[in-house]
């Protein structure tokens, strides 16, 4: 892994974006960036068990056509150092420290799943740091049933072992012909990066993340009425991991939000519908 000059990434596709490293309070954080310089960057916050290679290239490349995009491995994830904390608030604190280390004082946030929960922490703790948010496949802290995700994940991992498939075939997409086709297309896109791939998620990171999610599900709900940032909430209509009604509840509780629910799709609905989702995000981010 090498450290590259900041200007190297402007015209590079996500599959070719070099991995960089920055020291954040003594911990090396791995990240990649692409897209035009200037303006407010979009910082991507990854999902449960994800490393940078798990972002859909069509989503990042699509948004990077008009915005500078930054994706990173949070503390203890993938190529970043240290250990993953079993606490959503600490994950948010770590993400804030990373953003500050890059010298950014205003960002847009794109949080998917676990990343959406982390984005909410950031907006609550340092609201002046955030301009706009895209929250996909996620719900509010203290949402009923989110703490049951450990059982859902375990079931998917068992099915994956029996079928020799990635668990996300069962967690992200419905087991319909349309959903299976979308899953296969998604994994084909993830395989487009062939060089300089990230380190896989560790066992410690998996257990810490699921512990943080369960703890967050049992927590006292946050007062989201104070989060006044414009927010685009999106999900599929059959999300097994974060029930779609939690995304609807999130949108109701955020006073300046808009909601899109994609039909015949699950937790990965924004990837299944990337051709529709990306233009909607670009339109949302283009607003002042």
Descriptions of predicted regions:
Residues 227, 233-235:
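Short beta-strand/loop motif that positions the catalytic acidic residue
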